[in-house]
């Protein structure tokens, strides 16, 4: 189980008086609102806040960096690819795939670092330039740590190849030598350049002995007096035993050869062969692994881990992984010499050399400004089966916890939240719940964004979230008087109550305007019209109008009558339906049968005789309004005439 840490670091918010007790906090997915709630009472009726400001505190400001957004976007694809690596792969094939994924992550970090470096150089504002330079340093440290973790935890390099990997690691991250080399070689007389011996020394410190020999040949050409000792030094560099990638010799053979070579170097030192050249003698002491000679080159080494790798190269080139922590700690102590304390980066690298993965992740979580690094590194190490036994004290595992934190930060951004969805998908314990909580807080500014969110929810069968989003969009559409859109969203939400509300608005608009809006939607409701009685009535009433327009009068009359007798039509709409029957009653051909006419009469009498009930304004208007009275009289007259015609017609048909 993970041990509990000590007290968390206190973060002071500029402008907020932390000594006051009354503070209000409100947490969001990626930020927090803070304001003071203490008031100074001036008068009984007036309360004035002492600090009338609301502060927004963001925990992941890096998501708003344009360059770092590329890091997040490109690493997202690598992350998804890693999740799909076949679990059945084992041995070298699986290891090679995991190493390839690690290198892909590093290449993305390096690309962002180089772009950030260019932006820092081009920045006109000094403050921005410093900010970009600081970000470059952070990205550089991230790649440095990741590369070391790749060597120690993913490649798991054994003794021999381990040192070759560490040399490549140092050469990649201590790259000032390349610009220095170009400067020296570009001069008219390289061996007389002020930095010539510094360059040769750095090349030796980095184990680039072939390049160092080439530089010494220039010294030999320019100074015949020292040509002999330069040639001897060159031979020592050439014959130094190093385990190359394609070499088949065993570690024992390498150690024997290295021992003989080391003894030869000792003899040259004892014989004072290079006494006439302090520079060459210093190089010989370095190649003998003399710690004092190495520490004299502190400025050229620049950091303790460069000192560590050089020290191993010339004193224990077949170092075993298990012994690294001893050399790392002693190298750090020797290099700092008690003059300064280790930096956070030093502690992280030291933890890596001690093979303490969890301490590496913990230190990185504290030191780095966002969760990207620890989330992706931990996920990769988890795929290497290195974190299986580590659970956090609150029940989740470390991988999932860090991925959840990273994804939560992405949801604070207006567009990067889409990446966060996939990270939640690959958190089996709490990912689904977290996604549900975060996706409900996404501001649905546009319908296009809403459709994206909706599609994500539907793909994951998040029924409640789908319903909630559709309701929100339906309400927005109603407020904007877009009834067609509102009805569409309420149907999609399967919200019967809201569908009824929108249907009533459609019917009210029809009464006011005499026509329907959004006919295409109403005409194509299909089975969706069964969601609510009012929606069914709306669809069927529109169908009545369509039949009437197509002169299918008998079908239209039957449908109109069924809408009234089935009581599916709202009572407030009966007068409109009866008025719609008037043109059918006045047709030359008898449309309504005698029985149907009686039904219409019963509906009319039921409507006019019923006592007014609170809220039914249509009934009140029916009794009070002269226009409504005229309508009733016209209906009664038309119904009576139609009844007479229907009886005569039906009687004549029976007689024949």
UniProtKB/Swiss-Prot annotation:
The modification N6-acetyllysine is found at residue 92. It is found in: Nucleus, Nuclear pore complex; Chromosome, Centromere, Kinetochore; Cytoplasm, Cytoskeleton, Spindle; Cytoplasm. The modification N-acetylmethionine is found at residue 1. Changing residue 581 to P: In NPHS17; decreased function in nephrogenesis; unable to fully rescue morpholino-induced nephrogenesis defects in Xenopus; decreased interaction with NUP160. Keywords: Acetylation, Centromere, Chromosome, Cytoplasm, Cytoskeleton, Disease variant, Kinetochore, Membrane, mRNA transport, Nuclear pore complex, Nucleus, Phosphoprotein, Protein transport, Translocation, Transport. GO terms for cellular component: actin cytoskeleton; ciliary basal body; cytosol; intracellular membrane-bounded organelle; kinetochore; membrane; nuclear envelope; nuclear membrane. Changing residue 645 to W: In NPHS17; loss of function in nephrogenesis; unable to rescue morpholino-induced nephrogenesis defects in Xenopus; decreased interaction with NUP160. GO terms for biological process: lamellipodium assembly; macrophage chemotaxis; mRNA export from nucleus; nephron development; nucleocytoplasmic transport; positive regulation of DNA-templated transcription; protein import into nucleus. The modification Phosphoserine is found at residue 223. InterPro entries: Nucleoporin_Nup85. Its main location: nucleus. One of its GO terms (molecular function) is structural constituent of nuclear pore. Component of the nuclear pore complex (NPC). Component of the NPC Nup107-160 subcomplex, consisting of at least NUP107, NUP98/Nup96, NUP160, NUP133, NUP85, NUP37, NUP43 and SEC13. Interacts with NUP160, NUP133 and SEC13. Interacts with NUP37, NUP107 and NUP43. Interacts with CCR2. It is linked to Nephrotic syndrome 17: A form of nephrotic syndrome, a renal disease clinically characterized by severe proteinuria, resulting in complications such as hypoalbuminemia, hyperlipidemia and edema. Kidney biopsies show non-specific histologic changes such as focal segmental glomerulosclerosis and diffuse mesangial proliferation. Some affected individuals have an inherited steroid-resistant form that progresses to end-stage renal failure. NPHS17 is an autosomal recessive, steroid-resistant progressive form with onset in the first decade of life. PANTHER family: FROUNT PROTEIN-RELATED, NUCLEAR PORE COMPLEX PROTEIN NUP85. Essential component of the nuclear pore complex (NPC) that seems to be required for NPC assembly and maintenance. As part of the NPC Nup107-160 subcomplex plays a role in RNA export and in tethering NUP96/Nup98 and NUP153 to the nucleus. The Nup107-160 complex seems to be required for spindle assembly during mitosis. NUP85 is required for membrane clustering of CCL2-activated CCR2. Seems to be involved in CCR2-mediated chemotaxis of monocytes and may link activated CCR2 to the phosphatidyl-inositol 3-kinase-Rac-lammellipodium protrusion cascade. Involved in nephrogenesis. Belongs to the nucleoporin Nup85 family. This is Nuclear pore complex protein Nup85. It comes from Homo sapiens (Human). The lineage of its organism: Eukaryota, Metazoa, Chordata, Craniata, Vertebrata.
């Amino acid at each position: 189980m993970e041990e509990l840490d000590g007290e968390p670091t206190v973060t002071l918010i500029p402008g907020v008086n932390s000594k006051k007790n009354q503070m209000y906090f409100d947490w969001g997915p990626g930020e927090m609102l803070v304001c003071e709630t203490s008031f100074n009472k001036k008068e009984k009726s007036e309360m004035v806040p002492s600090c009338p400001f609301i502060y927004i505190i963001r925990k992941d400001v890096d998501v708003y960096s344009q360059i770092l957004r590329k890091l997040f976007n490109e690493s997202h694809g690598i992350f998804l690819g890693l999740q799909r690596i076949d679990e059945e792969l084992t041995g070298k094939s699986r290891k090679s795939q995991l190493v390839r994924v690690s290198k892909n992550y590093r290449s993305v970090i390096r690309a962002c670092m180089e772009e950030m470096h260019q932006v820092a150089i081009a920045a006109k504002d000094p403050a921005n330039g410093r900010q970009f330079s600081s970000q470059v340093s952070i990205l550089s440290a991230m790649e440095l740590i990741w590369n070391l973790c790749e060597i120690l935890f993913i490649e798991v390099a054994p003794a021999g190849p381990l040192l070759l990997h560490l040399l490549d690691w140092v050469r990649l991250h201590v790259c000032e030598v390349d610009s220095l080399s170009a400067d020296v070689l570009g001069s008219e007389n390289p061996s007389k350049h002020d930095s010539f011996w510094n360059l040769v020394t750095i090349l030796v410190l980095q184990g680039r002995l072939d390049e160092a020999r080439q530089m010494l040949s220039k010294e030999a050409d320019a100074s015949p007096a020292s040509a002999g000792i330069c040639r001897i030094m060159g031979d020592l560099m050439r014959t130094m035993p190093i385990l190359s990638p394609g070499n088949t010799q065993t570690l024992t053979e390498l150690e024997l050869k290295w021992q003989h070579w080391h003894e030869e170097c000792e003899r040259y030192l004892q014989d004072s062969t290079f006494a006439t050249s302090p520079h060459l003698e210093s190089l010989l002491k370095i190649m003998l692994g003399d710690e004092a000679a190495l520490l004299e080159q502190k400025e050229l080494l620049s950091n303790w881990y460069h000192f560590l790798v050089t020290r191993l190269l010339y004193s224990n080139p077949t170092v075993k992984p298990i012994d690294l922590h001893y050399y790392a700690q002693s190298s750090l102590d020797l290099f700092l010499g008690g003059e300064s304390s280790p930096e956070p980066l030093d502690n992280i690298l030291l933890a890596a050399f001690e093979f303490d993965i969890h301490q590496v992740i913990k230190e990185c979580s504290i030191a780095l400004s966002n969760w990207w690094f620890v989330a992706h590194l931990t996920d990769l190490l988890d795929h290497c089966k290195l974190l299986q036994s580590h659970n956090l004290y609150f029940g989740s595992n470390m991988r999932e916890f860090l991925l959840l934190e990273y994804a939560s930060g992405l949801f604070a951004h207006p567009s990067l939240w889409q990446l966060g969805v996939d990270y939640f998908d690959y958190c089996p314990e709490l990912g689904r719940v977290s996604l549900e909580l975060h996706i409900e807080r996404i501001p649905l500014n546009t319908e296009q964004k809403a459709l994206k969110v909706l599609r994500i929810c539907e793909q994951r069968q998040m029924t409640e979230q789908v319903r909630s989003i559709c309701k929100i969009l339906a309400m927005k559409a109603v407020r904007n008087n877009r009834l067609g859109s509102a009805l569409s969203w309420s149907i999609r939400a399967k919200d019967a109550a809201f569908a009824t509300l929108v249907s009533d608005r459609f019917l009210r608009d029809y009464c006011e305007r005499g026509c329907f809006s959004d006919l295409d939607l109403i005409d194509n409701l299909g089975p969706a019209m069964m969601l609510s009685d009012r929606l069914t009535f709306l669809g069927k009433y529109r169908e009545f109008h369509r039949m009437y327009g197509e002169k299918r009068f008998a079908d239209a009359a039957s449908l109109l009558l069924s809408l009234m007798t089935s009581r599916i039509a709202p009572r407030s709409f009966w007068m409109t339906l009866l008025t719609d029957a008037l043109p059918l009653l006045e047709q030359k051909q008898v449309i309504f049968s005698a029985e149907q006419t009686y039904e219409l009469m019963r509906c009319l009498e039921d409507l006019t005789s019923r006592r007014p009930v609170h809220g039914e304004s249509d009934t009140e208007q029916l009794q009070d309004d002269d226009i409504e009275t005229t309508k009733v009289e016209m209906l009664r007259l038309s119904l009576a005439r139609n009844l007479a015609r229907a009886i005569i017609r039906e009687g004549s048909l029976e007689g024949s």
